[in-house]
Structures are given as C-alpha cells and as structure tokens.
Amino acid sequence: MSKNLLDQLREVTVVVADTGDIEAIEKFKPRDATTNPSLITAAAQMPQYQDIVDDTLKGARQTLGPGASAAQVANRAFDRLAVSFGLKILQIIEGRVSTEVDARLSYDTEGTIEKAREIIKQYEAAGVSKERVLIKIAATWEGIEAAAVLEKEGIHCNLTLLFGLHQAIACAENGITLISPFVGRILDWYKKDTGRESYAPHEDPGVLSVTQIYNYYKKFGYKTEVMGASFRNIGEITELAGCDLLTIAPSLLAELQATEGELPRKLDPAKAKDYPIEKIHVNKYTFDKMHAENRMATEKLEEGIQGFTKALEQLEKLLADRLAHLEAA
C-alpha cells in the first residue's frame, strides 16, 4: 500500500502543527508546534479550553491582588495565556513550541528583549527548559536586533512575518535559530496585484521565495533553520518537501494524510551549492534599501503586524469580559 503524503513528508522534513488547538496537536503528533496571536485568540474562544482561560485569569488576579483593576488583571492574564497554551502543548509534543512576543513591540528592540525574557521566565518557573521554547518575533530590523541579543543569552528565536531575502539574510548573519518565511501570504499579494486567479505550485511566488532562501542558506553554510509557513493549499507544501521544517494548519495536515501518491524531495542541501545566487551582506542600510524596493514585503510585513495587533486587542477584550463574568458569579 502506498504511503500518504504526510507520512512521506515526515521522512524529509520536520512537520510542525500551526495551531493553538491542543486536540488537533494530539491527533497529528507533530514534533513541534507554533502559535501566534490569531491562533491563541481562536483557541481561547473554544469551549474546551475555557478552563485554561479561567485558570490564567484567576492566577493573574491572585498575583496582583484584589486592589488591581480588571484591566490590569486582564493585561497580566493576556501576557500569560500564550504560555499557558504553550505549557499544555509541550505536554503532548517532544520538541519545541513557538510563543510570540506582543506584535505592538515589533519596532521596539528593548521592549521585545524584555518581553521575551519574561516569557522564558514563565516557562522556566513551570519547569520547562528554554531549549524547548522559540520566541516568535516579527522580522523587522528592530526585531532582528532584539533576537540577536536574545540568542547570545541562549534564548532561541523564530523570526516570523518574513517575506523577503533581505530579512532572511539579516537573520542568518545574526545567528538566529529559525525563520518562518511565509508562503500563502506572498501568493495572496501576487494574486491581488496581478489579478491572476491561480498559480501552479512550481510557479507559486511564495514557494519560489522559500526555495531561494533555503538554497541561499545551504549554499553559504548558514545554520539558521528554515520553516516554511502560511500555506493556502497542499501543492505549496509538496513543492517544499525537504525544507528543514514546515508548519502546517490542521486542515492541511488532514488533507495530506488523506492523499496518496509519490512525494519527490524538492529541496536538498546537496543541490544548493549549484544554486545561481551571489552572497550579499545585509546591514541596516542594505536592509532598509532592499525592503523599500520590495513592495510586497513592505506591505505584507505591515499588514501582518497590524493583523496580529488586532488579534491581541480582541483577546484583551475577551479576557476583560470573561474576568467580569467570573468575578460577578
């Protein structure tokens, strides 16, 4: 009997679950898991995770005491909720969980460093080694600078909202543990910009972007791991078979599992040495110049930060409302 695509993918790529839904993680048994503000907000609204939300709120109230305002308690709980989900996820998976720093700090190097240290302290207080946590930070220049400091402290980072080679090179040159180049969001931009309704997987601009980044890293010997993210269909995933890691939503994991057929390896470090690309050094000037020249990366990075900020604000409101309900009961 032929193997399904998911089983074959696992042979050449580390499969990661892109979700805060603990039941989905139990079902697909990925090595690692990634969360973001939108995914945590979605999970926090699922009835089966109400206990996690309530326990986090009660813990925040206990820490701050009866004199703290509801807004202060909700704010403290908000800081802890992603870690609460992360701790549950780490009970299921063998590897690492990615927990995101507040997206509103995306252009604040010091603020990002402080928030990342706080997140790691919370995990360590719960008995989890920092080796099992990746701190997710938006790949702005300020975010990359923050991650470089954190990596020197032994705090591993996952640079997200990555849409261009300039962001990827800056991460590699700063010794970042892992990057999450986005595939589907790049496709979205090109479809909207060109009016073209579809792209074959091998022509997909998001696939081509990750392929370029992967080959650049392997050709020039960078250790930073490449984890393709943000997929719109399984064709994008199968075109990136062989990538170091791919983080995939449960619906697409299910589709891969239900699909049989041959899955050839597409990305291979042995072939990268012949990839036609020159080495580029990226400092702040080069980064800003390349970013300004890349309209897609500029627009998608801003849109991504705004989207995560909106999800954070929604979560803060949800927590404040839930706290009011709990304390009125």
UniProtKB/Swiss-Prot annotation:
Transmembrane segments: none
Main location: cytoplasm
Keyword Lipid metabolism attributed: no
Keyword set, alphabetical order: Cytoplasm, Pentose shunt, Schiff base, Transferase
Annotated organism of origin: Methylococcus capsulatus (strain ATCC 33009 / NCIMB 11132 / Bath)
Gene from which this protein is expressed: tal
Record-linked PANTHER family: TRANSALDOLASE (PTHR10683:SF18)
GO CC aspect terms: cytoplasm
UniProt protein name: Transaldolase
